[in-house]
Amino acid sequence: MKALVKTEPGYNKMELLEIEKPVPKDREVLVKVIYTGICGTDIHGFKGEYDRLKTPLVLGHEFSGVVEAIGKNVTKVQKGSFVTSETTFDTCGECESCQNKEYNL
């Protein structure tokens, strides 16, 4: 799949790349993004103003889309569900992404 990726720290440093489609783990879902917003966080990331961003990274944490695949322990949504996300304010704090401070994943 194609993604606009922040490849390294610093201003711009973005590339349109072909990346592997993720496979959801037991407690994760894969969302096909239909709409996304560009907010201040993304602009600061684009400009290289956040030193905590771990690259490579696909920017964008405000989005909506359709659940394309679910992990085996997911019970609250089904494949085909329409979902939205804003991960900055409410994260589980337990999954691998949260432990790695990759809250947007």
Model-derived regions: residue spans:
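Short N-terminal binding/cap micro-motifs at the start of the first secondary-structure element
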Residues: 11-15, 40-41
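Glycine-rich beta-strand-centered segment in the early N-terminal region that forms part
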Residues: 21-36, 49-99
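Flexible, glycine-rich phosphate/dinucleotide-binding loops
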Residues: 10-12, 52, 92, 104
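Residue-level recognition of beta-strand termini and adjacent short loop/turns
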Residues: 8-10, 25
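Iron-sulfur (Fe-S) cluster-binding segments and ferredoxin-like electron-carrier domains
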Residues: 43, 47, 99-105
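Extreme N-terminal starter segment of soluble prokaryotic enzymes
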Residues: 1-2
